[in-house]
Amino acid sequence: MNKLPQITLAFWVMKICATTLGETAGDLLSMTLNVGYAVSSMILISVFVLTLLTQLFSKTYNPVLYWLVILSTSTAGTTMSDFMDRTLGLGYATGSLILVSILVAIFALWKWSGESLNVSQVQSPRGEMFYWMAILFSNTLGTALGDYLADDSGLGFAGGALFIGATIAVVVLARYFTKISSVVLFWIAFVLTRPFGATLGDFLTKPLEKGGLDFGTIGSSLVLAGILVAMIAGAAYAKNRQAQPGMAELS
């Protein structure tokens, strides 16, 4: 049984919101609370493993659980990328190359396993595991790309967000006006929404003198969490409404 949501506009809005929240929440833990990148990564990876196991053992699609796993990959991806790039001193370029290699290896193994990379056809526990590993490392890669655009490219936080937003728009146009595989375009868009969320998150939280809006990690995280919770509640309500006719027929 497929336990993943349908890919709609609401999905992409929630994905961007979750990745932006992941950026601000990850920075809140590692920097604002001064926990550090290494310890924060261990804490958040543990949360990811816990939520992932719950998702894998679930029998049906649960919007709350699904988006909790997405959020845990986003927060863990933030601190994992920062640990690689800053604590280990690899830098954004080297860190991104390593993460691209890992992500390509995951997709290659996924394809080699015989499972479909089309998320609407993920039916088995093995396929779902590949799906979540791809999401974890795509979010980590997206963080590194977002930090590079914001810090090293000269675009700044707002410029980086606009650049990634324009690139995502090109992917959307390619979906409707080219014959490029929709599966390939989905994963390209999925990776790109992460740096979009990362640069947007930095734009919201960083000081004015650094080109941000200076909302802070706590305030930004609370606002984004409120938006995401409201949308998850809406998704759960819609799912329950869809299930009611079937239950009525059985009774």
Give the ranges of each region predicted by the language model.
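Polytopic alpha-helical membrane proteins, predominantly small-molecule transporters/carriers
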Residues: 1-251
